[in-house]
Amino acid sequence: MTLGNRRHGRNNEGSSNMNMNRNDLDDVSHYEMKEIQPKEKQIGSIEPENEVEYFEKTVEKTIENMEYEGEHHASYLRRFIDSFRRAEGSHANSPDSSNSNGTTPISTKDSSSQLDNELNRKSSYITVDGIKQSPQEQEQKQENLKKSIKPRHTVMMSLGTGIGTGLLVGNSKVLNNAGPGGLIIGYAIMGSCVYCIIQACGELAVIYSDLIGGFNTYPLFLVDPALGFSVAWLFCLQWLCVCPLELVTASMTIKYWTTSVNPDVFVVIFYVLIVVINVFGAKGYAEADFFFNCCKILMIVGFFILAIIIDCGGAGTDGYIGSKYWRDPGAFRGDTPIQRFKGVVATFVTAAFAFGMSEQLAMTASEQSNPRKAIPSAAKKMIYRILFVFLASLTLVGFLVPYTSDQLLGAAGSATKASPYVIAVSSHGVRVVPHFINAVILLSVLSVANGAFYTSSRILMSLAKQGNAPKCFDYIDREGRPAAAMLVSALFGVIAFCASSKKEEDVFTWLLAISGLSQLFTWITICLSHIRFRRAMKVQGRSLGEVGYKSQVGVWGSAYAVLMMVLALIAQFWVAIAPIGGGGKLSAQSFFENYLAMPIWIALYIFYKVWKKDWSLFIPADKVDLVSHRNIFDEELLKQEDEEYKERLRNGPYWKRVLDFWC
C-alpha cells in the first residue's frame, strides 16, 4: 500500500503509482530512524532503479510504527477514562431495606490478602491479624475503596491535619474578641475535650475499621438512626463548605504579596490543584497531605524559635517584650467579668473549627493498610498536637500581638495581613521571615482544602450507601474513587470564586459559621456512640478483650467531652443572642453567624423522624447489633502479642522504652 493510497483510504497493493516527493518524507518524523536503520541493512543491495520502492516501503513501515505509538499513547487516555467506570461489586444498598432493629443497613468494605484467601479455603473459621473471620465474611469482602493510606500518613494526620484556616487565620478575629488570655483558656477547654474525643474515636475506628464513612455511621446502629442521619448530613455540609472557605482564605493570604491581581486567578489555580490531587484517589490525597503536614509542622517549630527570640529582644526593633501586651491592653477584652467570660465562650466555635479534622484518622480507617496499629499510635500523639501546635504557639502569638491591633480580622483594618502568625513577626520589624511563614500558611490552607474535598466526598458516598442520599452518589470507580460524590465536592468549590467580591470577608464569616458549630455536633455523636457501645457490651455480656484498642480515658472521658460540648452549645447560644460588640443587641445576622448549624441540625433531625416515622429516642442497649460491621479480635492472641511486645521493650535499649511511653 502506497503512502498516497493510504492517505486516500485505498488499498491497491499492485498499484504502480510511485509519485512521492520530499514533502511526503518530511511528514515522517526522524524519531523513527531506529526502525529505518535495520531496514537499510536488509535492502542495502537494492538497485538504484528501485530506490523509490525502498523509500515507499520505509515510509510505510515508519507510519505503521507511528500509528502503533499513537495507539500506545492513546491507551493511557483510554485507561484513564476507563478508570472512572463503576468498580465491579460496587453497589448501593436499597434504601427500603432495614435490619432487625429498624436501623438503616451499613455497607461495609473489607479487603484481604492472597494469604488470607488461601487460609479461608483451608479453615472454616480463622483469625487474621487478631480478628476472627468466617469464610462467609471473607467471601463477602469487596475491594471498593483502596487501602492506600500507610501508618506514616496516619501519624502525620494526627499531628498536622487541620492546621489551617481556624488556627492560622481564624484566630485573628478571636484574639481581637477575647484577648490572649481568653483565647488560651478557650483552646485549653476545647483541647481537653478533643483528646477524649480522639481516644473514643480511635477505639471505635479500630473496631469498625471496615465501615465506609467512618464515624458518621456509628450513631446509626449504636445510638439513633435519626441522630446519625442529621449529624452525617451536617458534617457533609460542613466539609462541602470548608473547601471553598479554604480557597477564599488562600486568596486572602495571597494579598500579603499583591493586591493588583484579581483573587479569582489564584482561586482557579488552587481549585484545579485540589481537584487534580483527589483524582489520584486516596493515595494522592495521603501523599499530598503528608507533604503539606510536614511543611506545617516545620513552620510551627520555626515559629516557636523565632517568636521566643523576638519576645526576648534578640530580633526585631522593639527590644525585650515579655508579657507586656498581657498587661497593656490586657489579657482579656472587656471591662466586666461577664464581658470577659463571653469572650472566652466566643472562642469555642473557632477552636472547634481549628481542631476539626482531628477525627480524620477514623474517616480514613477503611483506606488504611493497618488501622489496628496506626490508629492507636496516632491517637496517643494527639496530646502533643494540642499542647504544642495549638496552646504553645497561641501563647507566643499573644505575647507578640496585642488584641487591639488594627491588622487583626474584626478590627478596623483589612485582611491583607490576616494571619496573627504573620503579624506576630512582621509587626516587630522582621522583614524576610514573614514571607516564608505566609507561604507555609498558604500550603496549610491548601492542605485543609485538600482534606475537606476528600472528606466531603467520602461522607456523601457513605450516605448514599446507607440509603440516606441519592443512590447515584454511591458510585465507586475502578480506582476506588467515589467519582459522583467527588463531582459534588468540586461543584461546591466554585463558591470560592466570590474571592474577588467586596463581600469576601462576609463570605468567609458565613462559611465559618456553618463549619465551626457543626464540629461540636460531630464530636458529641462520636462520644455518645462510644458510651452506647460500652453500655451495650456490658448489657450483652461481651468482653472488652474483643476490642483491639481501648480509650485511655475510658467511657468517663467521653461523658466529660459530651458535657463540655453541650455547655459550649449553650454558651454559644448566649453569645448569639447577645453578641460581642454592637452594644450586645440581638440581630438576625449576628445570631445566624454564631448559631447557624443548630437550626440546620434540628431541621434534618425532624425530617428523618417524619420520613421514617421512627419516634424512638435511642436504640436500647440490649438491641444494639454488636456483631455486624465489627472486627472481633481474638483476646488471647492480643494478650500474647502484648506480652511479646513488652518483652522486646524490656530487652531493648532504654530510649525505645521512653519513646514507647510518650508516643
Curated annotation (Swiss-Prot):
<dbReference type="GO" id="GO:0098718">
    <property type="term" value="P:serine import across plasma membrane"/>
</dbReference>
<dbReference type="GO" id="GO:0071944">
    <property type="term" value="C:cell periphery"/>
</dbReference>
<feature type="region of interest" description="Disordered">
    <location>
        <begin position="1"/>
        <end position="24"/>
    </location>
</feature>
<keyword id="KW-0813">Transport</keyword>
<dbReference type="GO" id="GO:0015171">
    <property type="term" value="F:amino acid transmembrane transporter activity"/>
</dbReference>
<dbReference type="GO" id="GO:0003333">
    <property type="term" value="P:amino acid transmembrane transport"/>
</dbReference>
<keyword id="KW-0472">Membrane</keyword>
<feature type="topological domain" description="Mitochondrial intermembrane">
    <location>
        <begin position="176"/>
        <end position="177"/>
    </location>
</feature>
<feature type="transmembrane region" description="Helical">
    <location>
        <begin position="507"/>
        <end position="527"/>
    </location>
</feature>
<feature type="modified residue" description="Phosphoserine">
    <location>
        <position position="124"/>
    </location>
</feature>
<keyword id="KW-1017">Isopeptide bond</keyword>
<keyword id="KW-0812">Transmembrane</keyword>
<feature type="transmembrane region" description="Helical">
    <location>
        <begin position="290"/>
        <end position="310"/>
    </location>
</feature>
<feature type="topological domain" description="Cytoplasmic">
    <location>
        <begin position="1"/>
        <end position="154"/>
    </location>
</feature>
<dbReference type="Pfam" id="PF00324">
    <property type="entry name" value="AA_permease"/>
</dbReference>
<feature type="topological domain" description="Mitochondrial intermembrane">
    <location>
        <begin position="311"/>
        <end position="342"/>
    </location>
</feature>
<dbReference type="GO" id="GO:0005935">
    <property type="term" value="C:cellular bud neck"/>
</dbReference>
<dbReference type="InterPro" id="IPR050524">
    <property type="entry name" value="APC_YAT"/>
</dbReference>
<feature type="topological domain" description="Cytoplasmic">
    <location>
        <begin position="364"/>
        <end position="381"/>
    </location>
</feature>
<feature type="topological domain" description="Mitochondrial intermembrane">
    <location>
        <begin position="241"/>
        <end position="264"/>
    </location>
</feature>
<feature type="transmembrane region" description="Helical">
    <location>
        <begin position="343"/>
        <end position="363"/>
    </location>
</feature>
<feature type="transmembrane region" description="Helical">
    <location>
        <begin position="265"/>
        <end position="285"/>
    </location>
</feature>
<feature type="compositionally biased region" description="Polar residues">
    <location>
        <begin position="12"/>
        <end position="22"/>
    </location>
</feature>
<feature type="region of interest" description="Disordered">
    <location>
        <begin position="87"/>
        <end position="117"/>
    </location>
</feature>
<feature type="topological domain" description="Cytoplasmic">
    <location>
        <begin position="286"/>
        <end position="289"/>
    </location>
</feature>
<feature type="cross-link" description="Glycyl lysine isopeptide (Lys-Gly) (interchain with G-Cter in ubiquitin)">
    <location>
        <position position="41"/>
    </location>
</feature>
<dbReference type="GO" id="GO:0031966">
    <property type="term" value="C:mitochondrial membrane"/>
</dbReference>
<feature type="transmembrane region" description="Helical">
    <location>
        <begin position="220"/>
        <end position="240"/>
    </location>
</feature>
<keyword id="KW-0597">Phosphoprotein</keyword>
<feature type="transmembrane region" description="Helical">
    <location>
        <begin position="591"/>
        <end position="611"/>
    </location>
</feature>
<dbReference type="GO" id="GO:0016020">
    <property type="term" value="C:membrane"/>
</dbReference>
<feature type="cross-link" description="Glycyl lysine isopeptide (Lys-Gly) (interchain with G-Cter in ubiquitin)">
    <location>
        <position position="34"/>
    </location>
</feature>
<feature type="topological domain" description="Cytoplasmic">
    <location>
        <begin position="199"/>
        <end position="219"/>
    </location>
</feature>
<dbReference type="GO" id="GO:0006865">
    <property type="term" value="P:amino acid transport"/>
</dbReference>
<feature type="topological domain" description="Mitochondrial intermembrane">
    <location>
        <begin position="582"/>
        <end position="590"/>
    </location>
</feature>
<keyword id="KW-1133">Transmembrane helix</keyword>
<dbReference type="InterPro" id="IPR004841">
    <property type="entry name" value="AA-permease/SLC12A_dom"/>
</dbReference>
<dbReference type="InterPro" id="IPR004762">
    <property type="entry name" value="Amino_acid_permease_fungi"/>
</dbReference>
<feature type="cross-link" description="Glycyl lysine isopeptide (Lys-Gly) (interchain with G-Cter in ubiquitin)">
    <location>
        <position position="61"/>
    </location>
</feature>
<protein>
    <recommendedName>
        <fullName>High-affinity glutamine permease</fullName>
    </recommendedName>
</protein>
<feature type="modified residue" description="Phosphoserine">
    <location>
        <position position="29"/>
    </location>
</feature>
<dbReference type="GO" id="GO:0015193">
    <property type="term" value="F:L-proline transmembrane transporter activity"/>
</dbReference>
